[in-house]
Amino acid sequence: MGGTDEIPANSEFSAAEVLGKYLRRPSLFLPLLGLTTLVLYSGSLFFDFVWDDWPQIVNNPIVRSWSNLPRAFGSDLWYHMARHQVYYRPLFVAWSMLNYALFDLQPWGWHFAALLAHVATVAAVFWLARRLGLEYWTAALAALSFALHPIHIEPVVWISAASDTMVTMFVALAFVAFLNGRDPLRTNKTAWRSLSLLLLACALLTKEMAVTFAALVAIYAWMRPLHGRNSQRRAVGAILEAIPYGLVTIAYMLLRKHALVHATGQFDPSHGVIDVIRTLPLVVSVYLQKLLVPVGLTGLYYTPYVTGAIFRQLVVPALVLGMVVAGLWYWNRQEGDSTIAFAGLWMLVGLAPALYLRNFGNGDFVRDRYVYLPSIGFAILLAMGCRRLPSIKGWSAQAVQASAVVLLCMAYVTASLAQQVYWASDLLVWRRGQALYPGNPYAEVGLSAEYSERGAHDRAIALAQKAVREHPEYAYGPLALAESYIRAGRFDEGRVWLQKIDPAYVKSEIGMATFAGLYGRMGDFDKALALCSEILTKEPNLYSALYNCGNIHFMNHQFGDAERLLSRAVELAPEQAAPKHFLGRALLEDGRNEEGQPYLRQAAALDSKVWDYHYWLGVSFEESGNMPQARAEYQQALKLNQDSTEAKIKLTALEGK
């Protein structure tokens, strides 16, 4: 691989020449790279929904109907859960609606859609690199490294992180359109500029990471001015070119503010600016480390605020970052190529929204998905560096560069395949995080909940106790311990820990709904229903509260109240199976089987994989005298849950009828 676009005429590399001749065509190179990427991540098609996929996708009524699209533009991503969230991503919700229409709740389809988004972004990176002035093979190498880099595992194989993939695709395309719009050789510059603004709007409506786009435009315009090179004219020109993008960003922020009228402020007000400044070098250095050596990847890094070990956690990272900046400055000055400086600034500016640490919980500052957009700059620098590798005795520069690329690809593919599996299930996600960062209370609490749901109560309690003991300041520790005790049937201990939970959490919508559910599980219906009354007084149309409180009334045999709340939940989310199922059961238990059976039918049709939906539909059929249908539903329930004693008993009883 040489430093020009031409294929070297060297008979020793005849095979490489033939291959290079064909790959020199983007129409062949990009599909081949896309296919390679699909194969690399094909294992994710067998992964389940994990982590935030459950509330954002599986249990989100909004994504189940296109009629909810206007609501997506007027509310936050978690509107159905609470009213004080800060995630405004309507285009991601629209993408989720499309996936639901195409794949229902089949995880493979959602994973395939997320993988296609990554492949599309890879193509956008190639196009961007070319428009930035990189020659063909350097741009191809940038796209290749971006496609295969293991740090992209999280946004590719975790469905909920596809918003990062999508926003990056839109940003890259918007910048390409911006570059085309300022190209003096093009005649349709106005159309390109308009397209650039439209693509920026799409990026902003996908995820907040695009808010720095105007800054990238200004930086590029200053580095490569259209008119004049004196500092004042360059600055004015850069500002003028960035103004339209700034106006689009301001319009987005106003729209976001209107939609998130109930959003709360900063997440962690207990740490000030000094804490943030001391911690930033460590956070940025961790990102740089993972880009350079992508091992030990997880969705649950733990980098708490720097309060001690100043030399190791502040001075050393700051010195390392200083050396990196100095190295890039020297490289840029030696070659006189502003692309080097711009790629470095792309990394920093692209990461900037994720560096406002007070938006996150203590220690939750590093996430691989946040570096997906900034890593375009890294891929460009890596490609430029590889293309400048010199000859070594006995090896031409082309041979050295080709060997380096092969070794890099082998390392990336190996590291990626070895670490993708940790996103296959919730249990693997939490176990990986807790194994790599055993001091992370968030990972301990999450793994505790996972163990508890699987019936490993002793393990769950031990992990929750560890989190409470080692991190008494962590607000969710007592809640996790209380839930673990309650799930284990140790209600007295559960009640003790419920009293130790942060009062601020208890007063929130999610907190009240959680407490109501836990009290209902223990049979403390008076306390549970009092909380239900309080939350529904504040938010009478909150789906999660209507559904949870309707179930509590059902468990307390208050079927009339259960019918009232669950009917409202069904009205708000007609595509959800669960509220219809429990509404049908409430009517069945209340002696109104004829009214309840249609709801039970609809629930089993909407979500045919839930065994007890079929079981209770069978009970309804049996009560109405339809024995063949009852038998069929009991058999389906037993097929889905072979350990169902209830279904076995019902089938045995029907044999004599």
Residue locations for each model-derived region?
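Polytopic membrane enzymes that build or remodel cell-surface glycoconjugates and lipids
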Residues: 2-492, 497, 507-510, 514, ...
